[in-house]
């Protein structure tokens, strides 16, 4: 494994990961053991969903984020599938809607109650039937409302209008083998896919055409994945011919050679990439690994810059990633992962260390919000639009609320003589120290204290006398000036 050791300037160089305390984990969850390389976990600012083991069908758990600690075995699940659930994903435009794909060849879309489940949810809002083999991939369109993509082991990609349960597009001739994953581009005009035939394809779903293809993007036989980046480039993970895990960056305009190719190690778990378009950081989580590596993607060679590795003791069965709008910006949190162990889910917080308490504009540019940019019908008609952006500044809460304190000091508490006495009123100035001295005496009752107060009193009297004489001289000079004698 060879990472570049050249020190380069980056605000993400010191990003560090930290697991939360045990009482903030989700304990006693029976994570699914099904053989499939999906994340098994989906999370949004309201809910955490985890695919779990279930007898007699498929199920997944939906928990409010605040429901940490031990999860009772009788806690209600979403359990309408007749076969194991393989993939789940929250709708980006509605935090209460989640889609699931299953071995029973169906896609189901569910509406989760506002406060979470109080009883098992068996009735989906809509059932989408069109695949002839198990459905291993479901992914929502990033900007068009109610548009959902599903891909099955029948090598078919279907695109649905969930609002009408209508099949919009069927792409059944572009993939000759099992589809490992699918990823939309930023505005949802194209998607890329990774296939068992070792090819990465870029596809226009509305025309049903192949825009670009790279055969043998990674030469190894193990699963690979491909995701679109914000600038249109494609990031892939896979294996070399010698079964070493690899990362690569591709320019869709020229797929002949990768812009960058890095080898990581010789572990055999599939690498799951998670991309943050706001920071251009890619987090790579290996199934069965106990680490999360992260890289910054830039326009400068070598393009993929290794930042750091978060390592823990337990291997991960799956990982979910919180959308940017669900992070705590006041703590400089730039990513949060939900790591699945065999029996629990552990949040891991990625933080950029900053000294200032102020909102960090450079870490939090405007990000994709929950509002859809298009309706399904507009997208079908050929319109494209980027995500509707929101500012995270309103979510910022200062970590330290400082109270204003005004301190008024008694002139006698300072041992040094002060020239702050009022020169215009020398007569009443003398009794004031005497009263203060009397008060100090009654409180202190010590001879030393009395002597100190008397010294201060004498100094103040001398000061008052001096100021009085000075005022007299000034008045005398003023009189001569007015009389024209000066």
Curated annotation (Swiss-Prot):
Keywords: Actin-binding, Coiled coil, Cytoplasm, Cytoskeleton, Phosphoprotein, Repeat, WD repeat. The modification Phosphoserine is found at residue 2. The keyword Coiled coil applies. The keyword Repeat applies. Residues 404-444 are annotated as: Disordered. Residues 446-484 form a coiled coil. GO terms for biological process: actin filament organization; cell migration. WD repeats lie at residues 80-120, 130-170, 174-213, 217-260, 265-305. It holds the Pfam family WD40_4. Phosphorylated in vivo by PKC in response to cholinergic stimulation. Phosphorylation on Ser-2 regulates the interaction with the Arp2/3 complex and cell motility in fibroblasts. Phosphorylation does not seem to affect subcellular location. PROSITE patterns: WD_REPEATS_1 (PS00678), WD_REPEATS_2 (PS50082), WD_REPEATS_REGION (PS50294). GO terms for molecular function: actin filament binding. Gene3D superfamilies: YVTN repeat-like/Quinoprotein amine dehydrogenase (2.130.10.10). GO terms for cellular component: cytoplasm; stress fiber. Residues 432-444 have a biased composition (Low complexity). It is found in: Cytoplasm, Cytoskeleton; Cytoplasm, Cytoskeleton, Stress fiber. Forms homooligomers, but does not form complexes with the other coronins. Interacts with Arp2/3 complex components, including ACTR2, ARPC1B and ARPC2. Binds actin. Belongs to the WD repeat coronin family. Regulates leading edge dynamics and cell motility in fibroblasts. May be involved in cytokinesis and signal transduction. PANTHER family: CORONIN, CORONIN-1B. This is Coronin-1B. It comes from Oryctolagus cuniculus (Rabbit). The gene is CORO1B.
């Amino acid at each position: 494994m060879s990472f570049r050791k050249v020190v380069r300037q980056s605000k993400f160089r010191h990003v560090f990961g930290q697991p939360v305390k045990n009482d903030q984990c989700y304990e006693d969850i029976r994570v699914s053991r099904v053989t499939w390389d999906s994340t098994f976990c989906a999370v949004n600012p309201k809910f955490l969903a985890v695919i779990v083991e279930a007898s007699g069908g498929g199920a997944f758990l939906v928990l409010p984020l605040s429901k940490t600690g031990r999860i009772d075995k009788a806690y209600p699940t979403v359990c309408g599938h007749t076969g194991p659930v393989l993939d789940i994903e929250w709708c980006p435009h509605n935090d209460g809607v989640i889609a699931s794909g299953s071995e029973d060849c169906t896609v189901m879309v569910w509406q989760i109650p506002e406060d979470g489940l109080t009883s098992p949810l068996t009735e989906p809002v809509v059932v989408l039937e069109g695949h002839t083999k198990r459905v291993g991939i479901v992914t929502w369109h990033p900007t068009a409302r109610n548009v959902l993509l599903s891909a099955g082991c029948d090598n078919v990609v279907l695109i649905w209008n969930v609002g009408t349960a209508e099949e919009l597009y069927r792409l059944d001739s572009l993939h000759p083998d099992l589809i490992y994953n699918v990823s939309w581009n930023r505005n949802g005009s194209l998607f890329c896919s990774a296939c068992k035939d070792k090819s990465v394809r870029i596809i226009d779903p509305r025309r049903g055409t192949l825009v670009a293809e790279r055969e043998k993007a990674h030469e190894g036989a193990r699963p690979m994945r491909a995701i679109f980046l914000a600038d249109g480039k494609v990031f892939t993970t896979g294996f070399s011919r010698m079964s070493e895990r690899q990362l690569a960056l591709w320019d869709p305009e020229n797929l002949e050679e990768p812009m960058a190719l890095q080898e990581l190690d010789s572990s055999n778990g599939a690498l799951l990439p998670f991309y943050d378009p706001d920071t251009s950081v890619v987090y790579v989580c290996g199934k069965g690994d106990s680490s999360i590596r992260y890289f910054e993607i830039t326009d400068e060679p070598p393009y993929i810059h290794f930042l750091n590795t978060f390592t823990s003791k337990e291997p991960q069965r799956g990982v979910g990633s919180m959308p940017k709008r669900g992070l705590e910006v006041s703590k400089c949190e730039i990513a949060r992962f939900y790591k699945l162990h065999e029996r629990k889910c552990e949040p891991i917080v990625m933080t950029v260390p900053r000294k200032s308490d102020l909102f960090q504009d450079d870490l939090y540019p405007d990000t994709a919000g929950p509002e859809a940019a298009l309706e399904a019908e507009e997208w079908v008609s050929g319109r494209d639009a980027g995500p509707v952006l929101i500012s995270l500044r309103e979510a910022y809460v200062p970590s330290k609320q400082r109270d204003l304190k005004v301190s008024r000091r008694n002139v006698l508490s300072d041992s040094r003589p002060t020239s702050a006495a009022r020169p215009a009123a020398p007569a009443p100035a003398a009794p004031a120290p005497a009263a203060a001295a009397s008060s100090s005496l009654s409180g202190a009752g010590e001879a030393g204290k009395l002597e100190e107060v008397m010294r201060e009193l004498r100094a103040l009297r001398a000061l008052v006398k001096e100021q009085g004489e000075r005022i007299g001289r000034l008045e005398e000079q003023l009189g001569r000036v007015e009389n024209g004698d000066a």
